[in-house]
């Protein structure tokens, strides 16, 4: 267990604790429990807080359960997609939910496990958060039509040469299907000219998002979160697609006027804001945190306070 403590560094931990400073009691929902780092710190700091932890990865959840042993009776852990499980929690606990945390990053345990397919040297081509899911990265890369690959590379990877990459993958798999993540990574490196980032980075991002329906789940969650009352919502994202969805949702939550934009005059009473955005600009890791945990470098945290 000490090895896990050393391996896993929760991103923006102090900033998360700061965001939830007003919370003293009630229920906090950690929608992406992972290895339980944020949850453990919050339960330690707030003795009257109850926690609901959600995660697709049952293996990670078992580790989190062990780490949270000292808080037995103060938490419940749920398996499954966080959008669906959060909706269920909100239906049951309602206004008792005082805080919601979403950390959209992949855990170090998943990234470093060569059997999971998240890193460039993996012996698998998987990328599933939920190991019971049918769709994995191998199916996407080896069997998706070229037009579908183009779409996910364009929309989820924001890759400029999405057509070229999709066609090259199709040409290669016709001769020899990709067997693992290293095979795919090496192939992409053989013809990519991008020197700023690893040639496989954006392709892996796009495939991972497709395999886990990450953006669809985030959209569903953000829609459901509108029903929170008096709660603090804290979301940590790791790429522009996620951050854009969160930023726009928070702006929408904070709108006073909900009239048609084509209207010349407000007729809605101009008091429909669900709360206030607490972060004018996203909070990012300090240089010291990035130095200690390079994987935190792209993290952005936004916080919203819902009205009671």
Swiss-Prot record:
Uppermost EC category: transferase
One Pfam entry name: Methyltransf_5
GO MF terms held by the record: rRNA (cytosine-N4-)-methyltransferase activity
Major subcellular location class: cytoplasm
InterPro entries linked to this entry: RsmH (IPR002903), SAM-dep_MeTrfase_MraW_recog (IPR023397), SAM-dependent_MTases_sf (IPR029063)
EC number, as in UniProt: 2.1.1.199
Alphabetical UniProt keywords: Cytoplasm, Methyltransferase, rRNA processing, S-adenosyl-L-methionine, Transferase
Protein residues bound to S-adenosyl-L-methionine: 36-38, 55, 86, 103, 110
HAMAP family, per the entry: 16SrRNA_methyltr_H
Functional note: Specifically methylates the N4 position of cytidine in position 1402 (C1402) of 16S rRNA.
Family label: Belongs to the methyltransferase superfamily. RsmH family.
Name of the featured protein: Ribosomal RNA small subunit methyltransferase H
Organism: Helicobacter pylori (strain G27)
Lineage: Bacteria, Pseudomonadati, Campylobacterota, Epsilonproteobacteria, Campylobacterales
Gene name of the encoded protein: rsmH
């Amino acid at each position: 267990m000490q090895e896990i403590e050393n391996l896993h560094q929760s991103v923006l931990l102090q900033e998360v604790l700061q965001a939830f400073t007003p919370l003293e009691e009630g229920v906090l929902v950690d929608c992406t429990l992972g290895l339980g780092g944020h949850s453990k710190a919050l339960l330690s700091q707030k003795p009257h807080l109850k926690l609901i932890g959600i995660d697709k990865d049952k293996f990670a959840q078992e580790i989190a359960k062990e780490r949270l042993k000292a808080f037995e009776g103060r938490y419940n852990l749920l398996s499954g997609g966080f959008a669906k499980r959060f909706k269920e929690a909100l239906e049951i606990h309602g206004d008792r939910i005082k805080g919601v945390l979403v950390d959209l990053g992949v855990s170090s345990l998943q990234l470093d496990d060569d059997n999971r397919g998240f890193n460039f040297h993996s012996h698998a081509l998987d990328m599933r958060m939920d190991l019971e899911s049918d769709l994995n990265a191998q199916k996407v890369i080896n069997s998706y039509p070229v037009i579908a690959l183009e779409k996910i590379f364009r929309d989820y990877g924001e890759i400029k040469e999405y057509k070229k990459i999709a066609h090259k993958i199709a040409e290669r798999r016709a001769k020899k299907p990709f067997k693992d993540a290293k095979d795919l990574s090496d192939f992409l490196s053989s013809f990519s000219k991008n020197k700023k980032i690893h040639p496989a980075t954006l392709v892996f991002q796009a495939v991972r998002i497709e395999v886990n329906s990450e953006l669809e789940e985030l959209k569903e969650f953000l829609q459901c979160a509108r029903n929170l009352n008096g709660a603090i919502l804290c979301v940590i994202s790791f790429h522009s697609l996620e951050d854009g969805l969160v930023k726009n949702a928070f702006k929408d939550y904070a709108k006073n006027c909900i009239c048609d934009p084509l209207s010349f005059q407000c007729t809605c009473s101009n008091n429909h804001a669900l709360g206030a955005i607490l972060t004018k600009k996203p909070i990012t890791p300090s240089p010291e945190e990035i130095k200690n945990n390079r994987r935190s470098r792209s993290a952005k945290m936004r916080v919203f306070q819902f009205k009671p």
